[in-house]
Amino acid sequence: MKTIQGQSATTALTMEVARVQAISSITKCMDTIPSEYIRSENEQPAATTLQGVVLEVPVIDISNVDDDEEKLVKEIVEASKEWGIFQVINHGIPDEVIENLQKVGKEFFEEVPQEEKELIAKKPGAQSLEGYGTSLQKEIEGKKGWVDHLFHKIWPPSAINYRYWPKNPPSYREANEEYAKWLRKVADGIFRSLSLGLGLEGHEMMEAAGSEDIVYMLKINYYPPCPRPDLALGVVAHTDMSYITLLVPNEVQVFKDGHWYDVNYIPNAIIVHIGDQVEILSNGKYKSVYHRTTVNKYKTRMSWPVFLEPSSEHEVGPIPNLINEANPPKFKTKKYKDYVYCKLNKLPQ
């Protein structure tokens, strides 16, 4: 009689899209991986990572906003211009809220039978990103990332489709709703600082982004052990399409000054990525961060990014108060759904 794990691996390999978790379980004793996961030489981590150097991404304490907001804004502005990524500490989200989020996500991927996971799979050709899946972007030359994922919206309530929320483990919904509640407070503060840093009123960037209509899209990335982490990537190099992305620490690599670097992260800090839409709103003053995710030979890695996105019909362009004769618009104003279509299909914006 097959074990549940064996059954799950067999099921995952017979699906229309083979799941990386299943491929990992079969290749774990090998010294090779399927060719579609082997990156070109100019992408392979072993060949392109600057070895022996670990970057210290800016760490910003956001607990003292009431005491010295000017200092906080300056730190966030500098990090957003120079790095496009920073870590916030003393953010107010209780450790147990983050731990519960991680616990239920891990249980979904590792304890729920494969057949049950497939019930909430993203349908081929679906317009929405939501659901359990494997491939996302149209990869160059058919190459794939060494990752399975689960997408679903966690805010606002009107945007949530619980069809894509796992029913098991039973505490999944509660853990995610609690995390969303706390995360919104952090996001509001970051939007305010980014707005003030551009010489705008504190509310202007949030309003330009859509205020209460901003969509919080959670993605759980599951990177199983990979026999050849020197050849594969979990997620290919990219910038996020979002306004900002908030995530619990994850071993992403950052491209800075012409090199790929490993980065030092603080446990239970919240990592902030500046995304494409804030770069557009700021007319290029803030920079979206170019990053990628590597994998590990011996252990599973997971991450929980939350992408703060416009609604699909929302139009995003440079904030009008930032535009004048000396600062003409550097980006087109367009509906977010059109931006996403172009980016996922590697078309010019």
UniProtKB/Swiss-Prot annotation:
Cofactor note text: Binds 1 Fe cation per subunit.
Binding residue positions for Fe cation: 238, 240, 291
Primary location recorded for the protein, binned into one broad class: cytoplasm
SUPFAM superfamilies: Clavaminate synthase-like
Pathway(s) it belongs to: Secondary metabolite biosynthesis; flavonoid biosynthesis
GO-annotated molecular function: flavanone 3-dioxygenase activity; flavonol synthase activity; L-ascorbic acid binding; metal ion binding
Role description: Catalyzes the formation of flavonols from dihydroflavonols. It can act on dihydrokaempferol to produce kaempferol, on dihydroquercetin to produce quercitin and on dihydromyricetin to produce myricetin.
Name of the protein in question: Flavonol synthase/flavanone 3-hydroxylase
Lineage: Eukaryota, Viridiplantae, Streptophyta, Embryophyta, Tracheophyta
